[in-house]
Design a protein with these regions (language model features):
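Gly/Ser/Thr-enriched, mixed-charge loops and adjacent short helices
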Residues: 15-19, 23, 39-43, 47-48, ...
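Conserved phosphate/anionic-ligand binding catalytic regions in large, soluble enzymes, centered on
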Residues: 44-64, 157-160, 243-251, 255, ...
Length: 589
């Protein structure tokens, strides 16, 4: 028996000897007695890390798995931190009692984990508003703000495979926790031993919420509407929606109806709450396969568009018909381009655009959005990947400027500030308004997108993932970033690099009149991130970002190409994609 297995067996024995339920002990015992110790090792070789985004892992017994004990331990640490901050009078407006919102999505064990979270919070004297059943992530964010709570938890693993569940921690503004509170919570969680957990729920402190909050949330979503007249004229827009078995199943159709849309169809098989996601290989709306049933129904009903939300209803997918009447999936960058263009231009036309308005994108999201904002004189800020950074920008500028929209290339968008996370109900309603407006002007949604390219120029966005598993892989990725910094790339696919950004050093270098000029990059909270960006003479942009959670390094390409007419879209796309091998070669991948 090697040293690792000895340590694993000792850790597993602690679970057999400890205060764990009999079912858990039986599962641990079976793993210990099995000839193949792989599952045992995977379950106990480390403790599931509470990171800056909370917890996420495969469900099962063991310290490296998502189960009620790990969830309770994390909640005890979070409760300790909330009470500590309150005691130190860290809030601007001290409250008599700390309160939190707790929600969950459709995943297996979600309700049990949410009730465990509520029990531990209440056992620590914290008031809990527990949703009666599954709800979208953005509604949890909304409820925290609406009820004046100091924090919250949503039990979800977003679009991960069915074996996973997770735990997202939120702060008083409805955003996922950010520095310094993320580090503070992590430190408290790491101090908690299982015997420190207070399990005995104080039921007087747990209040079930549901219908009234849904109504208030729907009213907030409705405030996003820009052109009600266009919707009224196109109220029969033919919409197919699928929640992919998740938390959008009730609220999204209700929101669409409240906006005035009357021709809404749902995919019945995927309206069933199902943590096994039985009708899809993966519940990730980025994957075309997940949209198959929606597209099939759309074909049958001759729909104008098909929209979907992921299991926790924060991200979206949009499918529309191209000029050949074929279904095409609109990627996350294209989605954000349409949102920003429509919001800025239509608010301007209707006299709603004001000087204090601003929009946000992440640093790896399309630069075409900057062109749109610049042309109309609207302030745009770049933030790090992850919606908590967009939420932080809203927090920093609250009271002085007004947020009107922001998003990231990974299929997330937020068109209002009543919520501080990605919001599929409002994003779906808004894309349907855009489709209605386009139809009102004799265009399909696809043709509207092409009209934006004709106005601002075409570019194709693509992402390359280079996977390097294991300890040696992590070292290789680290060395790749060192090499890029020590040996700067001067040319990509035959085009000279004229600007670079290093977000770890917060330095920008730009070629001006033949000389490199260095300047500082200003980011929220002066935070740094291990990201490099290159901009070339012909408008190419490359971003390099190691993943913080997976053994891979991501390369984001934005490739311009000529598109003289809308009919040249496919040709321009092919021309841009043909450059990818040359770009990869320049980067050594």
């Amino acid at each position: 028996m090697n040293d690792e297995l000895k340590q694993v067996m000792a850790k597993a024995q602690e679970w057999l000897d400890g205060n764990y339920d009999e079912e858990t002990k039986a599962q641990v015992r079976a793993m210990m007695e099995a000839d193949d110790k792989t599952e045992l090792i995977e379950s106990f070789y480390r403790t599931l890390e509470f990171g800056t985004g909370g917890l996420r892992g495969i469900m099962g017994p063991g310290c490296n798995r998502m189960n009620k004990y790990i969830v309770a331990q994390a909640t005890q640490g979070y409760a300790n931190y909330l009470l500590k901050v309150q005691k130190e009078n860290g809030y601007k407006n001290p409250v008599e009692q700390v309160s939190v919102v707790v929600g969950h999505d459709c995943r297996n064990n979600g309700r049990m984990f949410a009730e465990t979270v509520a029990a531990v919070f209440s056992a620590n004297g914290i008031k809990v508003y527990l949703f009666e059943s599954l709800r979208p992530t953005p509604e949890v964010s909304f409820a925290i703000r609406h009820l004046g709570c100091q924090g919250g938890v949503n039990v979800t693993a977003s679009h991960n495979p069915k074996e996973y569940n997770g735990y997202k921690a939120y702060w008083e503004d409805g955003s996922q926790v950010l520095m310094p509170h993320d580090a503070g919570i992590i430190a408290e969680v790491n101090k908690v031993k299982m015997e420190d957990v207070k399990w005995e729920a104080n039921k007087d402190l747990i209040q079930i919420i549901g219908g009234e909050m849904d109504y208030d949330y729907m009213q907030a979503v409705k405030s996003v509407m820009i052109d009600q007249e266009a919707i009224l004229r196109q109220k029969d827009l033919n919409i197919v929606y699928t929640p992919l078995h998740g938390a959008g199943r009730q609220i999204v159709p209700m929101c669409l109806r409240s906006w005035g849309f009357q021709n809404i169809h749902v995919v019945p098989e995927q309206m069933v709450i199902d943590g096994n996601f039985s009708t899809v290989v993966s519940p990730n709306p980025e994957n075309a396969e997940a949209m198959t049933m929606g597209m099939n129904l759309g074909t049958k009903l001759n729909a104008d568009l098909v929209v979907a939300s992921d299991p926790d209803a924060d991200r979206i997918a949009i499918v529309c018909r191209n000029d050949k009447n074929e279904w095409v999936i609109i990627n996350g960058n294209q989605t954000n381009i349409m949102y920003h263009h429509y919001i800025i231009n239509n608010m301007k036309k209707l006299g709603k655009l004001r000087p204090e308005h601003y929009v946000v994108k992440t640093i790896v999201t399309s630069e075409l959005i900057r062109k749109i904002a610049d042309r109309e004189g609207v302030t745009l800020t770049d933030e790090y990947t992850g919606f908590k950074w967009i939420a932080n920008r809203i927090r920093e500028w609250e009271g002085t400027r007004k947020y009107i929209g922001g998003g990231e290339e990974s299929f997330g968008f937020l068109p209002y500030d009543a919520v501080r996370d990605k919001c599929s109900p409002s994003a779906i309603c808004l894309i349907c308004e855009i489709a209605a407006w386009a139809k009102d002007h004799g265009m399909s949604l696809y043709e509207y997108l092409l009209s934006i390219y004709m106005e601002y120029g075409f570019q194709r966005e693509t992402t390359i993932n280079v996977v390097r598993p294991g300890k040696s892989g992590a070292e290789e990725i680290k060395q790749m970033m060192v090499n890029y910094r020590e040996h700067p790339i001067t040319e990509i696919a035959g085009s000279k690099v004229v600007k670079t950004k290093d977000f770890q050093l917060l330095k920008q270098r730009e070629l001006k009149d033949g000389q490199w000029v260095e300047s500082d990059i200003v980011m929220s909270l002066n935070a740094t991130s291990n990201v490099l960006q290159y901009f070339t003479e012909n408008g190419l942009k490359v971003s390099v970002r190691p993943s913080g959670t997976e053994p891979k390094i991501k390369f984001y390409f934005e490739i311009p190409a000529d598109m003289p007419t809308p009919k040249d879209y496919d040709k321009a796309t092919a021309e841009a994609e043909a450059l990818v091998p040359a770009i990869k070669a320049s980067l050594g991948i």
